[in-house]
Every structure is written in structure tokens, then in C-alpha cells.
Amino acid sequence: MPITANTLYRDSFNFFKNQLLSTLTLAVLAALVTTLLGHLFIPDSEQMKLLTEAEFTFATSGKAGIQELVSQMTPEQQSMIMRAGIGTIFSSMIGSVLLVGGVLTLVAAVSAGNRISSLQAIGLSASQLPKLFLLLLICTLLIQFGLMLMLVPGIILSIALALSPVIMTAERRGVFASMKISWKLAFANIRLLVPAILLWLTARLLLVFIIDRLTFIHSEMAGIILGVFNNLISAILLIYLYRLYMLIASPQQKSI
């Protein structure tokens, strides 16, 4: 019997509905971790004042361009910019790793007939989190690089690497082995992956647009709300990808 996208969508949403509390807990936890870690790297009020003064001085000088702005900053200001940038990436990656590891472990356990909580799911995935962090970091850098070149390469890489976290979690594969298998399986089942990835990207863009219009919400609260809903959207995609992989992964494919 052929696999259809409608069947997978229905199955994924049923799972999401039945495990809503656990999935929501993981989404909130990941968003809070991202926010808290982000605050550790955000410059304090005095440092922000220095950065603002540097930006104002640069703007009134009539120059343009990021390189010129950075070159006009003091070493302390450059260090703050670098720290904030690295901190933002690091905190976002940690939140993503907790979400991906927790959701995939939860799906695997429930599919096997075991009942576990969201915290147990994170605990069971702990041994995989370092490798998962490296995998997500590499995939994110590749996809962002593709998006910077042109939009299409980034979308293609998003589709090609979509199954790699599932493969790593389900099969205990290494980073590059998971990426290689994902590449082959993704293009062999592209009709089932493209709609899901495009829906995921569209939903995230719409969410950013909606949250940005809610000006009455404090910026920090808006950031947390955006993170939670983004995580819920990603959780639905992860459930879909796990279900898809379980259906398409034959013993021959697993031995690649």
C-alpha cells in the first residue's frame, strides 16, 4: 500500500493531539532555556549605552556598511558584538537540541508502547544530545549558507537534511552517516517531504508576522511566545518526519 501525505498528516496530528501536554512542555522548556541563555550573553545597560553611542556616532558620520561600523568600534565594543552574536546562536542551538532530542525520544517511546513524560524524554535522549548538537549546527550552517546564496539552495538543503536528526536518534548513526542517508532517502521520497517542509517554513513566517503585529505585548514576552509556537510547529514536523522514516526505512536502507 503506497504511503500518502494525507495519511501521514492525519497520523502526525493525532499523535500531537494525544501527546499535547508533553509536547507543549518540551516546547515551553526549550523556549525558556533559549531565552535564559540568551540573557547571559546580552550586554548590560552600560554596555548597551556604549554600543548605542557608537552606532549614533557612525550614523551621523554619513558612512554606511557593517564593516565600516565594526572598524569604528573600540575593541571592547567589538568584543561585546561578537559575544552577543555567538551567544544568540549558542542559546538557540541548545534550545533546538533539547526540543529535537526530547520530541524524537518521546515519539519513539510512545510508538513502542511506553508512556514517558517530557522530562523523561529529555533524560533518555541525554546521551545523544552532544552528537545531535553537532549535527544541527552543521545542518543549520549549511542551510543558512544556502539561503544567503539564493533562496532555492537553502530550501533544497532543508529538504535533503530533514531526516538526519531522526536517523541519528532512531538508528544511533554518526553525524555524517545520518546526513548521507537523509540525502538519499529525502530525494527518493521528495513528494512526501516537500509539502511538509514548505508548510513548516510558511507557518514560521506567518507566526513571525503575527507576533510582530502584537505591539501591546512586551518584547521579551513576545519573544518567548514566538519561541513556544515555533517549537510547537517544529514538533509537529518532527513527528511527521519520524513517522515517515519508520515507513520508508527498509532493512536495506538502514544498512547504508
Swiss-Prot record:
The keyword Cell membrane is annotated on this UniProt entry: yes
Keyword Glycosyltransferase found: no
Annotated membrane topology: Multi-pass membrane protein
Ranges annotated as spanning the membrane: 23-43, 89-109, 132-152, 192-212, 221-241
Pfam families referenced in this protein's UniProt entry, alphabetically: UPF0259 (PF06790)
Domain of life: Bacteria
GO cellular component: plasma membrane
InterPro entries: UPF0259
Compartments where located: Cell inner membrane
Keywords from the UniProt entry: Cell inner membrane, Cell membrane, Membrane, Transmembrane, Transmembrane helix
Family: Belongs to the UPF0259 family.
Name of the protein: UPF0259 membrane protein plu2479
